[in-house]
Amino acid sequence: MNNQDLINDKSKNGLTYAKAGVNIDMGNAMVEKIKPFIRATKRAGTDAEIGGFGGLFDLKAAGFTDPILVAANDGVGTKLKIAIEVGIHDTIGIDLVAMCVNDLLVQGAEPLFFLDYFATGKLDPEQGAAIVSGIAKGCQQAGAALIGGETAEMPDMYAKGDYDLAGFAVGAAERSALLPSKDLTEGDIILGLSSSGIHSNGFSLVRRIIQQSDLKWNDHAPFNPQMNLGTALLTPTRIYVKSLLPIIKSYKGIKALAHITGGGFLENIPRVLPSSLCAEINLSAIHVPSIFSWIAKQGKIEKIEMLRTFNCGVGMIIIVAQHEVEKVTQELKMQGETVTLLGKLTKRQNKGITFKGALHL
């Protein structure tokens, strides 16, 4: 039997993979749609072409001499549910990339490449292409190449229209430039970089508040009447790589970073500190965006719970030696970041973080 015979040998009554719910042709159609997005992420070290069994990256071509590889993977939690219900799919991929590459940045690493996992019950090529376009935008913002991924069509695993996303990022740092630095000391200054909003944590709580308030996704956002609620909540997570990475490389006084994600201030800042030091944060210095004030008021959420769940307007923490604070602050502002002096490192007594002042919600 030759190839043509195989193609023509179709039993009208026989089962096929497509009849079982997996349409390979739809998957191939989606691949063709996303190729231009992926090519746009090309960078030194890779051609950002897909189709092979694995993606390749040349560390030497990327300019590293003694690199340490750094890996991170993450998802976007139940922010996905809002994207699905609102029908906006071209920004959630930015969140996916942000959650991974911002974690790489905390180690002092430059994001090199990214891979995604997209799973759904029934593949919609248009929806899938929109999602990947967002992932590609995030990769461009981070300077990372999108070198591969997996699209899984799994009948009966997901409700109609639902999907899930996961991302995996790899970066590199020169061995001598890894963060956090070992010379963190009392008196080092804590700076905060503003977030773009909720980012990608705490959405199960946000969704519960919205359910109790009877608001609809197309209603005006109570905290931002110029936008509808769904669009406002889907504001993408800020990616700090291009503004912060050159400064990390230029100033040895930058000793540590902390990405304020799940666990908020309470969990994430102590993670980068030695057991002898404590972060003293002045809550009065934080400019809390109206979205968090609305969440706290609507849900009757205590301030400590807000600080443990949300970024409260601060998406990235930087710990800097006193003598370089002014220069680092100026550089960050020139890169378009909003910088706040939040506190300093002190000798640890019991906890890895203490607060003074009041959080103005």
Swiss-Prot record:
A Gene Ontology cellular-component term: cytosol
Gene: purM
Coiled coil, from the record: none
Catalytic activity: 2-formamido-N(1)-(5-O-phospho-beta-D-ribosyl)acetamidine + ATP = 5-amino-1-(5-phospho-beta-D-ribosyl)imidazole + ADP + phosphate + H(+)
Organism: Bartonella henselae (strain ATCC 49882 / DSM 28221 / CCUG 30454 / Houston 1) (Rochalimaea henselae)
GO molecular function: ATP binding; phosphoribosylamine-glycine ligase activity; phosphoribosylformylglycinamidine cyclo-ligase activity
Name this polypeptide is given: Phosphoribosylformylglycinamidine cyclo-ligase
Primary location recorded for the protein, binned into one broad class: cytoplasm
Protein family (similarity comment): Belongs to the AIR synthase family.
E.C. number: 6.3.3.1
InterPro entries: PurM-like_C_dom, PurM-like_C_sf, PurM-like_N, PurM-like_N_sf, PurM_cligase
Pathway annotation: Purine metabolism; IMP biosynthesis via de novo pathway; 5-amino-1-(5-phospho-D-ribosyl)imidazole from N(2)-formyl-N(1)-(5-phospho-D-ribosyl)glycinamide: step 2/2
GTP-binding as UniProt keyword: no
Subcellular location(s) per record: Cytoplasm
Keyword Protein transport included in the entry's annotation: no
Pfam families on file: AIRS (PF00586), AIRS_C (PF02769)
UniProt KW keywords: ATP-binding, Cytoplasm, Ligase, Nucleotide-binding, Purine biosynthesis
